[in-house]
């Protein structure tokens, strides 16, 4: 549905849905935080979404900052070859910062206890530190848009890009991403030998 809407020219605001299971059990934490029952938490989330939809205007910046994340080699990657063409066409329309998340530079989330994740997240950090805390979190905060360069490995993201997404949880505790545009450049190949985007 999101892809069809995007292809039709729609822009989706950050967190554009309120998702409730049949029992609304996925609203337990929100209900506790709000001092209400499950239905009250669900309705509060829906009301907050309606307010954001009602007041949303697409941000206009003269020269937006774009963060580009990848986990590929510039020398051998079809994904990076396609990005080079896109980057060239962007010209000076935006400021671009690229961060490579290659093997060995990014540890995946190992599932800290909820309270520990909140503790570090409120400081804008993550227990596991590394490139995420030093480079990626500050870059995500500054960026107006994020581009994820994704080779398609058996209909899935690479491990490093999956780790990046998993580790965003700590940053989300402090920074909502509602004002950021998200783009993906996905490249599939036939055993890595042909470029199909």
Model-found features: residue ranges?
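FMN-binding flavodoxin-like domain, especially the glycine-rich phosphate-binding loop
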Residues: 1-97, 129-131, 135-142, 148-150, ...
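Cysteine-cluster motifs in flexible loop/terminal segments that predominantly coordinate metals
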Residues: 98, 104-137
């Amino acid at each position: 549905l999101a892809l069809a809407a995007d292809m039709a020219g729609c822009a989706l605001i950050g967190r554009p849905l309120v998702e409730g299971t049949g029992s609304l059990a996925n609203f337990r934490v929100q209900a506790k935080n709000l001092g209400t029952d499950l239905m009250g938490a669900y309705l509060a989330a829906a009301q907050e979404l309606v307010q954001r939809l009602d007041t949303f205007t697409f941000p206009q910046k003269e020269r937006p900052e774009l963060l580009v994340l990848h986990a590929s080699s510039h020398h051998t990657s079809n994904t990076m070859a396609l990005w080079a063409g896109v980057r060239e066409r962007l010209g000076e329309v935006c400021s671009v910062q690229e961060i490579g998340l290659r093997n060995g530079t990014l540890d995946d989330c190992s599932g800290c206890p909820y309270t520990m994740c909140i503790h570090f997240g409120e400081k804008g950090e993550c227990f596991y530190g590394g490139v995420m805390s030093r480079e990626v979190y500050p870059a995500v905060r500054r960026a107006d848009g994020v581009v994820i360069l994704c080779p398609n490995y058996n209909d899935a993201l690479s491990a490093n890009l999956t780790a990046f997404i998993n580790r965003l949880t700590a940053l989300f505790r402090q920074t909502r991403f509602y004002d950021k545009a998200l783009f993906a450049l996905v490249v599939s190949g036939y055993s890595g030998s042909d470029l199909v985007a």
